Amino acid sequence: MEEVFDKHGSFDTERFGTHAHSITCVMSSLAQLAELTKDSTLMNRVKAFYDNGLWTMRDELGWSIENCGEGPNPDEGEMNNTGDIVETALILGDWGYTEYYGDAERIIRCHILPSQLRDISFIKDPANPNKSDGKINVGPR
């Protein structure tokens, strides 16, 4: 763990890989573990990464690129990452770093809530001759 989530919170694809959700889910899982075990050293590493390395793959609204490698489409993101970022911010807030609540609130108000569909009337089920479950009730899902 110390080789990947270093004390400076730096990010390097050689250490972390390029799939952003793999990185953010480990970050939020380590925050959960640190909270559960009351491990301040581990929480400090999570905080250092949140404050430093995470910014190479996220923006102010919590949007996060899907792939951090060279050549990915910079317009492709993954909402799972955003959920991990919010979860980590809330844990850091609970840990006493209350300024992270503001980050979580901004992400929820400015990214997660506006991205939710309220009117699904325009969504039609696609042709589905093979009765694939993923193509049934697409809108309501």
Predicted regions and their residues:
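Glycan-recognition and catalytic cores of secretory/periplasmic carbohydrate-active enzymes
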Residues: M1-R141
